[in-house]
A protein has these predicted regions:
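N-terminal and secondary-structure boundary signal
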Residues: 1-205
């Protein structure tokens, strides 16, 4: 088992954040390896879409047998929400991530970067979540939910709906109206409508 991460951009240090959060100690106890993506190797990956031709992805993500995402549930001032599709941005080399912010179409660019890797399972920790602001500062509330799926579009749709249950949230549109999800559907990254999603409840957290 390998636990990997890449902080958003300098001066944030992935190694520092891992140490602060106790990840190194937890991995030692579990017998897991740690991968600090910015300190490792990157592999070019071609993308489908019109906004990126290719990006570099952390090599361990392409060589592992199974890739499991561990995501947060939050709003985002630029991409509107940050769940599993936006989580994929952390898989990409920082200098390529910077291109998100040039040329407009930020939400569509997020969806295209998400096509660089294919997780087998996505787990979203929504015990607490941002309901306004984000990704780093904003209004935090308790959502008391854990989500798991193999489909990034499906889990992001449900994640948005969980945020929308909380009074004062910033997400006012039907999930399928957000451009990040619309472009992900065009790229074939997941479910295309509610009829393709089955919600199975497994108790409360």
């Amino acid at each position: 088992m390998i636990v990997g991460e890449s902080s958003r951009h300098p001066p944030t240090s992935t190694r520092y954040e891992f140490r602060r959060a106790g990840v190194f100690a937890a991995c030692r106890r579990a017998g897991a390896e740690v991968a600090i993506f910015p300190e490792g190797e990157w592999t070019p990956v071609r993308l489908r879409g019109s906004l990126f031709r290719w990006v570099e992805v952390a090599r361990p993500l392409l060589e592992c047998d199974r890739l499991i995402y561990a995501c947060c549930l939050k709003t985002h001032w630029l991409s509107k929400f940050s769940i599993s599709l936006k989580h994929s941005v952390g898989c990409v080399r920082p200098r390529h991530r910077a291109r998100l912010h040039f040329g407009g179409h930020f939400e569509e660019r997020v969806a295209e970067l998400a096509g660089a890797v294919q997780p087998s399972l996505i787990v979203v920790d929504g015990r607490q979540c941002y309901v306004r602001g984000g990704p780093c500062y904003g209004v935090v509330r308790e959502a008391n939910v854990l989500l798991a799926a193999g489909d990034r579009v499906a889990i992001d749709v449900q994640g948005i709906r969980e945020i929308q249950r909380i009074p004062g949230n910033a997400l006012r549109h039907d999930p399928w109206q957000y451009r990040q999800l619309q472009h992900a559907v065009r790229l074939g990254l997941g479910a295309a409508n509610d009829d393709q999603i089955a919600l199975v409840q497994a108790g409360s957290c």
